[in-house]
């Protein structure tokens, strides 16, 4: 029965968004997710640095990642690690001497964005430096892709290895570099899934599993499912000429009525997947 709900929610979410932005524009966004792949360590490290800043208002304090290129040796994680090691204060002071970022730089404030970023940048470089090439990194990633229970273990590893990169940001990093088995369990996705009672709590792992399951029953990539829910929740299409505003309240109310109707239908003789004894095979892809 839950699979039927997940199927209905995704299909209606896509139609809901198509009405707001147009099918062509939506497909353009989704096609980028399906096809974009990083293929070198420089772009990989750039995306890692960007992912670290993708929370609250941190990016406004750090500024453009591109403006930091000279401090990270053209975004070479190996050279960055060789030069700084894990000495985040050295990096912090070098940036402060060489650039005036948009946000304050206070080396004595443990939780300040620049302290968090400096620590995350160097622990991220240290992690990537374990791989001699992008091909070696890719092979490591693929070790986690053979089963749906293994897929979320990878962001758990990144969460432990890279300072300031929690589970959602690790998922964000992986999806943005082209690993489409990953969706980010952010506040907008959580609001929608919780609002529709498709998850029992806002736990990152539980939300991630539900995104993965929703993708499987719809024969879609988890990253695409994530993007559609995010666009509805945030209203941020990425095109300044298109403003739709946050639509999650409207969508949730519409879907509640449809899910109630589905419950009535299933309760009058139609069986869900679980009642029929059917299982959707777990294994592979966001």
Regions found by a protein language model. Give the residues of each.
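Structure-specific DNA junction-binding interface
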Residues: 1-113
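C-terminal accessory module of base-excision DNA glycosylases/AP lyases that mediates lesion recognition
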Residues: 1-42, 116-125, 133-286
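Short alpha-helix boundary/capping elements
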Residues: 53-61, 77, 129, 181, ...
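Generic hydrophobic/packing signal
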Residues: 96-99, 125-132
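Aromatic-anchored, charged helix-turn/loop surface patch used as a conserved interaction hotspot
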Residues: 104-105, 122-128
């Amino acid at each position: 029965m839950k699979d039927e709900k997940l199927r209905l929610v995704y299909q209606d979410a896509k139609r809901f968004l198509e009405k707001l932005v147009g099918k062509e524009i939506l497909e353009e966004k989704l096609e980028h997710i399906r096809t974009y792949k990083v293929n070198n360590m420089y772009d990989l490290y750039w995306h890692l640095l960007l992912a670290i800043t993708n929370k609250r208002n941190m990016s406004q304090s750090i500024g453009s990642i591109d403006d930091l290129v000279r401090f990270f040796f053209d975004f070479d994680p190996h050279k960055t690690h060789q030069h700084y090691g894990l000495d985040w204060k050295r990096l912090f002071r070098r940036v402060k001497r060489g650039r005036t970022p948009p946000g304050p730089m206070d080396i004595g404030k443990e939780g300040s964005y620049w302290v968090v970023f400096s620590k995350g940048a160097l622990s991220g470089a240290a992690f990537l430096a374990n791989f001699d090439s992008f091909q070696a990194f890719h092979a490591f990633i693929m070790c986690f892709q053979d089963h749906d229970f293994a897929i979320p273990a990878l962001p758990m590893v990144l969460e432990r290895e890279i300072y300031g990169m929690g589970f959602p940001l690790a998922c964000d990093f992986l999806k943005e570099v082209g690993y489409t088995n990953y969706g980010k369990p952010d506040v907008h996705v959580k609001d929608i899934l919780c609002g529709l009672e498709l998850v029992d709590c806002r736990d990152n792992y539980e939300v991630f599993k539900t995104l993965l399951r929703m993708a499987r029953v719809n024969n879609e990539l988890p990253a695409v499912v994530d993007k559609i829910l995010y666009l509805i929740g945030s209203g941020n299409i990425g095109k300044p000429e298109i403003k739709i505003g946050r639509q999650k309240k409207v969508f949730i109310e519409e879907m509640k009525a449809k899910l109630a109707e589905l419950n009535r239908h299933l309760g009058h003789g139609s069986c869900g997947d679980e009642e029929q004894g059917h299982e959707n095979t777990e294994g592979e892809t966001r």
